[in-house]
């Protein structure tokens, strides 16, 4: 008995303190929720479950003290016999003795029945206790998950600006499972422990109050010490979690931006950033281990001291004939078990306390009522919206940057059915205006009205439903094309979808895809080209049949051909709708009814194209800038001959992925989502994780062997203390079963009491050392594993990240949970195992010496208990894997919704995501309920076995004593040594769930750590030539993306660029242009053919060396959430970049002045993924970043496509400056930007179709010529 308590005695005995004080104290030490609030989501059935479970737990708890009553009476029966055989001198007494022995056996049979009866009761109530509490918890957690997700979906955009997306995902997974841990069977165990406590004390007082009071005198000391430790511990737990949360955020950001990290060789830097955050968590963890173990050691010292005192006093009472020895034992054990049970309660209290902490954050978010409530039913829903819009004196600044005023008194009127174009420089408030109209934010002052009605009085959802939005970077969800369009409006029919798709000019390309409307678009739509995504987004907006259409640079990121098609679709869509267009390319807005010029947060001029050209204001300036430099660039808009388009669509399939890939660069960051949710869960379940042995896990910790040696030694000593206790205990009782004089009794009992005290001192020392050494080793291991896993993740090649199983969400979850779970299976757990083995081992050896017959009987029983434990472990381990997998599925849905929250909101699809999330929780929920029963059955069986073994043991013991084969003293010794030992083994089985999880986690970890990618970013092999001239050659290169092996991208591409030349790649969207850049960066290797650099094959070159000479600027640059200076310095991670260099690069990229104008200059943080900057600003920072590398080869992947005229002009100048003296490969949609390239190559269907200079190609009158004329035509 005593052992099982003592391990948990760890955080010990604080119960009394906590129960009473918790409310008061916790209030000051924010933030936890009150005890009853924890159960705010319990329905009546849950309450019933909890009630019945609690009753069962209380009955179960009383069983142990009751057994002590039986035990005491039984000891008296033995003792009365024990005093006889010594007088057995003659035959007469001999006969008399056999009567007595006969009577003893009879009595023992009765006691055996009592024991069995108690056991049978326990079998039933223990099952009810565990399964009912687990059921209640499973049901509540299911509700909490849904409520929490609902609450997140219900928040307004401003809330997301200030909350970290990664953190929300962690809360959804980790914090909710913490609540789960805290409100399930642990509470049942707590009530059980409390019942044992009260039961024990009641029996103690009724059977012998004097002794009880003496034992009680020591309890407050125990309670106090424990209470203090518990407080200290919980504060460490919080700090540790915070410390890891930071590291987790770093990991999420890095994995999301993995392409950027790889291209800039930032792995080392990121590893360091991650590692520094881990260091903090490790330090706190070690402190926590020390604290926990001092408290445990102290508790043991006090416990043994109380034994010493109790036995010393108890013997005095027996000698003075006040109590019988049986009474002393009953009182002693009942009170002791009672006191210990508080120790047992403590881990449960700790779990509950952790749960309260986790619930605080979660319930807070659930209770946070947004000021713009998208679920609200209130608000006016006009029957007929004409679409007259008015912005009156609008002032606004973003909640995350209140000091920066964006709009400063904006006034604008739009008549129903008009098209208004907003033009102006990047960052002047155009997009903000559109966001205010959708009520993603409310203005700080001023009114936005529709048909004269303040939009704040209109129902939010209704308002957003009458608005269709197409933005610059459309977000598609990881499902089919049809489903994506359905996100526009829920009850839309297939006919309506087809109609919308035709209007959006997307029907033809969809019908050419192998699965047509059921084609999966991939994470963030990664399998489609930009033009295709954009058209699907338009179809999605049209299917809503909106009264108001908002086009936020809907065509800026497209190439000429796609743009022509998309623009045509938009023009069709605008008919009869009030439309607000934001465009950088002014050609797209010439035919708007009103053009409004923005400057400095207000509208400075409005009128149509002709009027504004006469006014010669901002618009005029913008137009002139565009026409001067970019003759043709406007062209992108106009239609192409039908057959060209089909052609384009065919090819765009080929490399659908390529363009995408580029986009996904930035996108993937925002959307750790899987290819297809259905697939994710299924596949994940079949995932073959090689099983792994315990030793393999320990090996991970091998470098901490000195800690282990000390720890294991202490654990062995600790284990041996238990049998030592049994010996002393049986000797004490033995003193009274022998017929000796009082003086000898007094002397013996004093000696044994002293020995108890010595045991205490030893245990204090060994517990502390054991805990400290294993705790430290465990923390070092956790840190090392997280580091190794992260390091290994960063080492993988890009195709590994393309794999739907390795989305950002899935990987960050791995990092967060796996290492912690492995720690669970090493250090402290190993200590418990060693301790228990030592305990049973010494116990068995001693028992065999003192009474082999009884030992053998007991050893027959013990395995049954052990087997039950093993079965329990097996059942749970299968469960562990399934649990994890199933929740990953719902995690993906959640991450997708949270990451793309703006899109979800503007499509008013919060409800849809909630339903999907709820759907994905069904299976884990059903399994939780199933598990409750399994857990209940195994638990009750192991518990009840103990009582049955008591019955068998003492009945057989009586038989042996009667035959004079053993003395009662030895029966006790053998019994306590073996039974306590066995309980200790039960303890090992009780940690089954953790171990099962740890094995699964460890296999994952080892799988990741040992995975060597085909393109190894860390490899030191390969050539590192001293000079690099920059001659690039592609020879018959064949390639397709690993995730879509059936779609060829490059089909025998030949290209050559001489050093210092600028090569421009043009072609329709998805023809393989970006792929060229990715192959040169060695994100992928070609399937056939070779890429040469200065005549050497790139796969012969050292990867790091190769990438160090390439500078890349892509269409949607990814910035990290740190300062501008740090973002620029990221360009060269191989050295420390000085502030001068940073500024020089910034000047070259034309962004220095802008940075200097910011309040914090170069130390301004750019926000998550650079959200605090406009596109043009981000782009220039990205260019500065590429220049800091001083690359020999510059890769520009549509670096200016997403910019407005003014930014573009500036950026283009920066790029022209940057190209000087470098080999440069440019991918451009706007042909004006590449007229002066040394070589222009037209790619179609993955092959080169034409090449030459601008003039030569125009003379050929081929594909290039027609592209140029399309663009120029648009211009005129």
UniProtKB/Swiss-Prot annotation:
Interacts with PSMB5. Found in a complex with ABCB1, TFPI2 and PPP2R3C; leading to the dephosphorylation of ABCB1. Expressed at a higher level in intestines than in kidney and liver. ATP 2 binds at residues 1067-1074. The keyword Transferase does not apply. It is an enzyme of class 7 (translocase). Residues 67-113, 206-212, 314-327, 730-753, 851, 955-970 are extracellular. It is found in: Cell membrane; Apical cell membrane; Cytoplasm. It is a multi-pass membrane protein. Its EC number is 7.6.2.2, 7.6.2.1. The modification Phosphoserine is found at residue 657. Residues 389-625, 1032-1270 form the ABC transporter domain. GO terms for molecular function: ABC-type oligopeptide transporter activity; ABC-type xenobiotic transporter activity; ATP binding; ATP hydrolysis activity; ceramide floppase activity; efflux transmembrane transporter activity; floppase activity; phosphatidylcholine floppase activity. ATP 1 binds at residues 424-431. GO terms for biological process: oligopeptide export from mitochondrion; phospholipid translocation; terpenoid transport; xenobiotic detoxification by transmembrane export across the plasma membrane; xenobiotic transport across blood-brain barrier. The chain crosses the membrane at residues 44-66, 114-134, 184-205, 213-233, 292-313, 328-349, 709-729, 754-774, 830-850, 852-871, 932-954, 971-992. This is ATP-dependent translocase ABCB1. InterPro entries: AAA+_ATPase, ABC1_TM_dom, ABC1_TM_sf, ABC_transporter-like_ATP-bd, ABC_transporter-like_CS, P-loop_NTPase, Type_1_exporter.
């Amino acid at each position: 008995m005593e052992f099982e308590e003592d391990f948990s005695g760890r955080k010990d005995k604080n119960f009394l303190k906590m129960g009473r004080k918790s409310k008061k104290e916790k209030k000051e030490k924010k933030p936890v929720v009150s005890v009853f609030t924890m159960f705010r989501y319990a329905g009546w059935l849950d309450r019933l479950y909890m009630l019945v479970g609690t009753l069962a737990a209380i009955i179960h708890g009383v069983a142990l003290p009751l057994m002590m009553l039986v035990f005491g009476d039984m000891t008296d029966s033995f003792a009365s016999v024990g005093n006889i055989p010594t007088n057995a001198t003659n035959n007469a007494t001999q006969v008399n003795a056999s009567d007595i022995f006969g009577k003893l056996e009879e009595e023992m049979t009765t006691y055996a029945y009592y024991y069995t009866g108690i056991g049978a009761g326990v079998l039933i109530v223990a099952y009810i206790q565990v399964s009912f509490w687990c059921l209640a918890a499973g049901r509540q957690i299911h509700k909490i998950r849904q409520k929490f997700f609902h609450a997140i979906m219900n928040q307004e955009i401003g809330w997301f600006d200030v909350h970290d997306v990664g953190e929300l995902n962690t809360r959804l997974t980790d914090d909710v499972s913490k609540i789960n841990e805290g409100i399930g069977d642990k509470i049942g165990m707590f009530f059980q422990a409390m019942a044992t406590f009260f039961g024990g004390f009641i029996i103690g007082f009724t059977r012998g109050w004097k002794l009880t009071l003496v034992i009680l005198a020591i309890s407050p000391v125990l309670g106090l010490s424990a209470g203090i430790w518990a407080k200290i511990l919980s504060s460490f737990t919080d700090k540790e979690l915070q410390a890891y949360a930071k590291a987790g955020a770093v990991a999420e950001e890095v994995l999301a931006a993995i392409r950027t990290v790889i291209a800039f060789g930032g792995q080392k830097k990121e590893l360091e950033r991650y590692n520094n955050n881990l260091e903090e968590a490790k330090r706190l963890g070690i402190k926590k281990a020390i604290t926990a173990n001092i408290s445990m050691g102290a508790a043991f010292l006090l416990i043994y001291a109380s034994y010493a005192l109790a036995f010393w006093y108890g013997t005095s009472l027996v000698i003075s004939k006040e109590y019988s020895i049986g009474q002393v034992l009953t009182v002693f054990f009942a009170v002791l078990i009672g006191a210990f049970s508080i120790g047992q309660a403590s881990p449960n209290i700790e779990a509950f306390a952790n749960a309260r902490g986790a619930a605080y954050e979660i319930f807070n978010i659930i209770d946070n009522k947004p000021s713009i409530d998208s679920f609200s039913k209130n608000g006016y829903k006009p029957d007929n919206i004409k679409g007259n819009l008015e912005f009156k004196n609008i002032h606004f600044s973003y909640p995350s940057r209140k000091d920066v005023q964006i709009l400063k008194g904006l006034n604008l009127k739009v008549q129903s059915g008009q098209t208004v174009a907003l033009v102006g420089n990047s960052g002047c408030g155009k997009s903000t205006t559109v966001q205010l109209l959708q009520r993603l934010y409310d203005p700080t002052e001023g009114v936005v009205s529709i048909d004269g009605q303040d939009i704040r009085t209109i129902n939010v959802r209704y308002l957003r439903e009458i608005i269709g939005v197409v933005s610059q970077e459309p977000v598609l969800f990881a499902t089919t094309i049809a489903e994506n369009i359905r996100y526009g409006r829920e009850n839309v029919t297939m006919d309506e979808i087809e109609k919308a798709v035709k209007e959006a000019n997307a029907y033809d390309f969809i019908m050419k895809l192998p699965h047509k409307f059921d084609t999966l678009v991939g994470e963030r739509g990664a399998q489609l080209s930009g033009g295709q995504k954009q058209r699907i987004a338009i179809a999605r907006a049209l299917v809503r049949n909106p009264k108001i259409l908002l086009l936020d640079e809907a065509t800026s990121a497209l190439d000429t051909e796609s743009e022509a098609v998309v623009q045509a679709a938009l023009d069709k869509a605008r008919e009869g709708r009030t439309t607000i267009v934001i465009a950088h390319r002014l050609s797209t807005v010439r035919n708007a009814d009103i053009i409004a010029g923005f400057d400095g947060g207000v509208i400075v001029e409005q009128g149509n194209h002709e009027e504004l050209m006469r006014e010669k204001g901002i618009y005029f300036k913008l137009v002139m800038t565009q026409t001067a430099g970019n003759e043709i660039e406007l062209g992108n808009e106009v239609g192409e001959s039908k057959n060209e388009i089909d052609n384009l669509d065919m090819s765009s399939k080929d490399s659908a992925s390529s363009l995408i890939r580029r986009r996904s660069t930035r996108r993937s960051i925002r959307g750790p989502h899987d290819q297809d949710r259905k697939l994710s869960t299924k596949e994940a379940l079949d995932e073959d994780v090689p099983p792994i042995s315990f030793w393999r896990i320990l090996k991970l910790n091998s470098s901490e062997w000195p800690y282990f040696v000390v720890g294991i030694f202490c654990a062995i000593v600790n284990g041996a203390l238990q049998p030592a206790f049994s010996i002393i205990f049986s000797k004490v009782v033995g003193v009274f079963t022998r017929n000796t004089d009082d003086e000898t009794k007094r002397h013996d009992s004093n000696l044994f009491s002293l020995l108890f005290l010595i045991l205490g001192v030893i245990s204090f020392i060994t517990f502390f050392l054991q805990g400290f050494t294993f705790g430290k080793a465990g923390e070092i291991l956790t840190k090392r594993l997280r580091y190794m896993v992260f390091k290994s993740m960063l080492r993988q090649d890009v195709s590994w990240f393309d794999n739907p199983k390795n989305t950002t969400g899935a990987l960050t979850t791995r990092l967060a949970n796996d290492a912690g779970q492995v720690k669970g299976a090493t250090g402290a757990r190993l200590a418990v195992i060693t301790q228990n083995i030592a305990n049973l081992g010494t116990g068995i050896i001693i028992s065999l010496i003192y009474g082999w017959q009884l030992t053998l009987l007991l050893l027959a029983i013990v395995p049954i208990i052990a087997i039950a434990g093993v079965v329990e472990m097996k059942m749970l381990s299968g469960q562990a894997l399934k649990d994890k997998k199933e929740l990953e599925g719902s995690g993906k849905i959640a991450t997708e919704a949270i990451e793309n929250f703006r899109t979800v909101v503007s499509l008013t699809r919060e409800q849809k995501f909630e339903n999907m999330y709820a759907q994905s929780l069904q299976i884990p929920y059903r399994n939780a309920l199933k598990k409750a029963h399994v857990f209940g059955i195994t638990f009750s069986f192991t518990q009840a076995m103990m009582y049955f073994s008591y019955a068998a043991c003492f009945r057989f013991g009586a038989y042996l004593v009667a035959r004079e084969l053993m003395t009662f003293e030895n029966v006790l010794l053998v019994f306590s040594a073996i039974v306590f030992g066995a309980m200790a083994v039960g303890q090992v089985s009780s940690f089954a769930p953790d171990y099962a999880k740890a094995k699964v986690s460890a296999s994952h970890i080892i799988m990741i750590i040992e995975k060597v990618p085909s393109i190894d970013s860390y490899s030191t092999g390969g050539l590192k030539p001293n000079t690099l001239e920059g001659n690039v050659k592609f020879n018959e290169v064949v390639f397709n993306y690993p995730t879509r092996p059936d779609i060829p991208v490059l089909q025998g591409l030949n290209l050559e660029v001489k050093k210092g030349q600028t090569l421009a790649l043009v072609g329709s969207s998805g023809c393989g242009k970006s792929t060229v850049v990715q192959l040169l960066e060695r994100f992928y290797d070609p399937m056939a053919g070779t890429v040469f650099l200065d005549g050497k094959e790139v796969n012969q070159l050292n990867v790091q060396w190769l990438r160090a000479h390439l500078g890349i600027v892509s269409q949607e640059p990814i910035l990290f959430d740190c300062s501008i200076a740090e973002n620029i310095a990221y360009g060269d991670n191989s050295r420390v970049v000085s502030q001068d260099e940073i500024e020089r690069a910034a000047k070259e990229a034309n962004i220095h002045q802008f940075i200097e104008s910011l309040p914090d200059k170069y130390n301004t943080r750019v926000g998550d993924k650079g959200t605090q900057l406009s596109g043009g600003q981000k782009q220039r920072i990205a260019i500065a970043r590429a220049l800091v590398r001083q690359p020999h080869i510059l890769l520009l992947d549509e670096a200016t496509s997403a910019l407005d005229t003014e930014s573009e002009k500036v950026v283009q100048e920066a790029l022209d400056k940057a190209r000087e003296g470098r080999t440069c490969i440019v991918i451009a949609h706007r042909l004006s930007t590449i007229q002066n390239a040394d070589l222009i190559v037209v790619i179609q269907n993955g092959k080169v179709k034409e090449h030459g200079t601008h003039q030569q190609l125009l003379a050929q009158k081929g594909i290039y010529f027609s592209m140029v004329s399309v663009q120029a035509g648009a211009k005129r």
